[in-house]
Amino acid sequence: MFHGSLVALVTPMHEDGRIDEAALERFIEWQIAEGTNGLVPVGTTGESPTLSHDEHKRVVEITVEVARKRVPVIAGAGSNATREAIGLAKHAESVGADGVLVVTPYYNKPTQDGLLRHFTAVADAIGIPLIIYNIPPRSVIDMSVATMARLAQHPNIVGVKDATANLTRPLHTTAACGASFCQLSGEDHTALAFLAAGGVGCISVTANIAPRLCAEMQAAWRAGDLKTAMAIQSRLLPLHDAMFAESNPAPAKYAASLLGFGSEFCRLPLAPLAEATKAQMRAAMTGLGLLA
């Protein structure tokens, strides 16, 4: 189903904070040309918490329209309000998204039973695949493997974006949910190790800037060429470090601006990058030949 390098798209903006639709369209075309295996708009990296509902939906619509089924689109549809998540998921389905990514509800700290009910309600409301997004550092709730196994029995819940950074999780998830449950890493630094533990791909922040290398690493692993996969991951390490030197997506948006895709602007409360972080990013990109 979903595999390889899927990019967690930034949302390009003008300097005044308006969404730069033309830059987004060019960015998507470039991503596909560079070999990205899938597009994931309006997630954490897409600044979904600071987008209005209309903006959120428009970004999904543009992504689907430009992609034209050349690669799958997994639209962000997360919320800490179940009714809102259902609405976003139904919109994504209505405009042609291939799946939805639904984050564990943040701030209100539901119990495991609450998580079970939330995801079941969203999955019941749509007819396209749903990927659970488990990211305890941001949501302050960790879905247990037992809860995930129960949700995996739902025909529309097909996998997880695992951003726990715990490399024992995919092993336990495979044991509980079966090998067909689609496990995608949400951590660029451990993406290769995640594959070795049972994953099938990565929803990547770094792929915003180095889509070809990220896709080639995933392809090398699938081809059984571990030496090449390890070499690419080693080359990417300085860029991974720069990408997460400050809160995502500020570094990624600065890097994208250097490539000509929108400005570096992030909506508050995300602040502009420190000059030292900008220098780190430029050095990492130059080292990979992404900047002259």
UniProtKB/Swiss-Prot annotation:
GO terms for molecular function: 4-hydroxy-tetrahydrodipicolinate synthase activity. GO terms for cellular component: cytosol. It is an enzyme of class 4 (lyase). Signal peptide: none annotated. Disulfide bonds: none annotated. Its EC number is 4.3.3.7. Keywords: Amino-acid biosynthesis, Cytoplasm, Diaminopimelate biosynthesis, Lyase, Lysine biosynthesis, Schiff base. The keyword Cytoplasm applies. It catalyses: L-aspartate 4-semialdehyde + pyruvate = (2S,4S)-4-hydroxy-2,3,4,5-tetrahydrodipicolinate + H2O + H(+). It is found in: Cytoplasm. Pyruvate binds at T45, I203. Pathway: Amino-acid biosynthesis; L-lysine biosynthesis via DAP pathway; (S)-tetrahydrodipicolinate from L-aspartate: step 3/4. It comes from the Bacteria. The record marks T44, Y107 as: Part of a proton relay during catalysis. GO terms for biological process: diaminopimelate biosynthetic process; lysine biosynthetic process via diaminopimelate. The active site is at Y133 (proton donor/acceptor), K161 (schiff-base intermediate with substrate). The keyword Cytoplasm applies. Belongs to the DapA family. Homotetramer; dimer of dimers. Catalyzes the condensation of (S)-aspartate-beta-semialdehyde [(S)-ASA] and pyruvate to 4-hydroxy-tetrahydrodipicolinate (HTPA). This is 4-hydroxy-tetrahydrodipicolinate synthase. It comes from Acidiphilium cryptum (strain JF-5).
